């Protein structure tokens, strides 16, 4: 075995140990194919710089799946996920690979990115479980096809948590959870989020801090659940959640 391959194997083992989950041969092949396609498409459109080595495996794959460590212990369970601002496909495509019985909706406002997401989903054999939508979160959250229709609504690195909450909560069914992926997380941010969630008829279920392997830093996951049906006026019109954020 070459030194590079040995290093990759060690790196992968660290990640799988951290997740307490390991991919099947088919799933590993899908991740590798996804990495290859990202590199290829990056030459056409600017998707992400995190495509090589640990950049891909730790900062993309592990960072996408670690917040779902509980769900990964039962990957056979069927859930409906929506990934808001999916961009280059993380965390949505990673979740689709890891959770073979779940359906994933990838939402992004950029038609270039959704073209990529459609092509990649087809190339790695996931198009039967992945739906790609070109639309703003504020519009999709009012669409009866999507509103109140998901077990999990997820966003990674989109905006501040109180803004993201207004995007996510309208998508949740009565037992659904919104998951906000963050780097650092402060008590001040938590208080603002609590106030925002009160207006959305939702609450923080819990927060959890993770340390990514390979010295990739700290991540926080905020899990949110609905208390009651999200008021019909949310999400507000395009741009308003960012310009006039809830929680102040």
Swiss-Prot record:
* Amino acids binding S-adenosyl-L-methionine: 85, 90, 108-110, 137-138, 156
What is one GO cellular-component annotation here?
A: cytosol
Q: What is the enzyme's main class?
A: transferase
Entry's localization field: Cytoplasm
Q: What is its EC number?
A: 2.1.1.-
Q: Which of UniProt's keywords are assigned here?
A: Cytoplasm, Methyltransferase, rRNA processing, S-adenosyl-L-methionine, Transferase
Pfam families registered for this protein in UniProt? GidB
Q: Name one GO molecular function term.
A: rRNA (guanine-N7-)-methyltransferase activity
Source species, domain of life: Bacteria
User: Does Transferase count among this protein's keywords?
Assistant: yes
Q: What is its main location?
A: cytoplasm
Question: What HAMAP family would the database entry show?
Answer: 16SrRNA_methyltr_G (MF_00074)
Similarity field: Belongs to the methyltransferase superfamily. RNA methyltransferase RsmG family.
Describe the task this protein carries out: Specifically methylates the N7 position of a guanine in 16S rRNA.
Please give the PANTHER family that the UniProt record associates with this protein: S-ADENOSYL-L-METHIONINE-DEPENDENT METHYLTRANSFERASES SUPERFAMILY PROTEIN
Designated name of the protein: Ribosomal RNA small subunit methyltransferase G
From which source organism is this entry?
Answer: Prochlorococcus marinus (strain NATL1A)
Instruction: State the encoding gene.
Output: rsmG
């Amino acid at each position: 075995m070459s030194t590079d391959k040995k290093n990759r194997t060690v790196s992968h083992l660290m990640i799988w140990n951290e997740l307490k989950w390991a991919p099947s041969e088919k799933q590993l092949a899908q991740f590798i194919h996804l990495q290859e396609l990202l590199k290829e498409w990056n030459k056409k459109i600017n998707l992400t710089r995190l495509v090589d080595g640990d950049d891909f495996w730790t900062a993309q794959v592990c960072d996408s799946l670690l917040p779902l460590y509980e769900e990964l212990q039962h990957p056979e369970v069927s859930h409906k996920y929506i990934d808001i601002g999916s961009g280059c496909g993380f965390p949505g495509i990673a979740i689709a690979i890891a959770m073979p019985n779940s359906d994933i909706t990838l939402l992004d406002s950029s038609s270039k990115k959704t073209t990529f997401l459609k092509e990649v989903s087809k190339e790695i054999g996931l198009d039967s479980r992945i739906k790609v939508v070109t639309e703003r979160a504020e519009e999709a959250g009012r669409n009866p096809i999507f509103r109140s229709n998901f077990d999990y609504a997820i966003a990674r690195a989109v905006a501040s948590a109180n803004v993201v909450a207004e995007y996510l909560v309208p998508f949740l069914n009565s037992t659904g959870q919104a998951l906000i992926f963050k780097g650092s997380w402060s008590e001040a941010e938590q208080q603002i989020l609590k106030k925002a969630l009160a207006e959305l008829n939702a609450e923080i279920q819990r927060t959890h801090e993770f340390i990514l392997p390979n010295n990739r830093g700290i991540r926080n996951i905020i899990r949110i659940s609905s208390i009651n049906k999200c008021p019909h006026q949310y999400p507000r019109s395009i741009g308003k959640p960012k310009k006039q954020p809830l929680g102040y």
